[in-house]
């Protein structure tokens, strides 16, 4: 996932990962073993999957990007019978497991890396990057409305809310009004066209380490792909399919998604269902206990070797024998934004 209010001090496109981030910490928290079944819900370039397979565990690897799945076929041949690739949203990882292993099957671990794949960023035709000219697309699959659809069809107020909440863009209102005025004369269809229009509007301080369009591009991508909703549903799905003692490991890169993961594990620790405003109703048995203390970050050596790891945080939990808690998306405090399926029909 792109920058969501985390460490924006990195270079442009800093959310992109070219090498597996926190790989040693992921394996230590996940503890894969020979014969175990691990779900890699965000296959991407396959960095985590390869390392898990090397421990002797089997992997069900999920990615909604057909290009990533196709690229993974070579790894599938390298580990015959031990890697199953599934083209799917990671929010439906429970359905993917049922498809591969049978209904009701549980797994030993789930790992999620909430970062955009370098393969997607590096391909100009995918339209993720303002550093390369390409169609204003940003979809992780070929389905649904594109970023161009959002930019050219959404109301000004909705665009401003998307830029503000999903990108924490301080010029959200100004940029949205500029887009409304410009698109009436000429719709936005190319990445550099939008990036240049934003830079012309807000200017660029020579001291800034990121491009003025960074936060707008991140917000559009998160919106078009429903990345926050995907993360929320994936956490709930992982809770349903993990065996007692199974481990959920999540790597995030920015503060908004890290807060979602932190809130999930805190809620799943159980306790009273009441609050300081309402009387206690019942005690909720924990569905997860901590696998690590708080959030784990990169070592100084990894930061030196891979600056993109600088803002990475790992959180992990161990599934208890208790049943899943309430399957309620309101836990995550997701913003009310226009539905993308409505956008497609507009």
Swiss-Prot record:
The record's Pfam families line, in alphabetical order, gives: Methyltransf_5 (PF01795)
What's in the keyword line of the UniProt record? Cytoplasm, Methyltransferase, rRNA processing, S-adenosyl-L-methionine, Transferase
Upper lineage is:
Bacteria, Pseudomonadati, Pseudomonadota, Alphaproteobacteria, Hyphomicrobiales
State where it is primarily located: cytoplasm
Region feature (Disordered): 270-346
Q: Which InterPro entries match?
A: RsmH, SAM-dep_MeTrfase_MraW_recog, SAM-dependent_MTases_sf
Please explain the role this protein plays, according to its UniProt record: Specifically methylates the N4 position of cytidine in position 1402 (C1402) of 16S rRNA.
Identification of the protein by name: Ribosomal RNA small subunit methyltransferase H
In the record, what terms sit under GO molecular function?
rRNA (cytosine-N4-)-methyltransferase activity
Originating organism:
Brucella canis (strain ATCC 23365 / NCTC 10854 / RM-666)
Residues reported in the UniProt entry to bind S-adenosyl-L-methionine: 46-48, 63, 90, 113, 120
- Report which reactions are catalysed by this protein: cytidine(1402) in 16S rRNA + S-adenosyl-L-methionine = N(4)-methylcytidine(1402) in 16S rRNA + S-adenosyl-L-homocysteine + H(+)
- Quote the cellular component terms of the Gene Ontology held in the record: cytoplasm
Q: Which GO terms describe its biological process?
A: rRNA base methylation
Give, as one word, the top-level EC class. transferase
- EC no.? 2.1.1.199
Localization? Cytoplasm
Tell me its family.
Belongs to the methyltransferase superfamily. RsmH family.
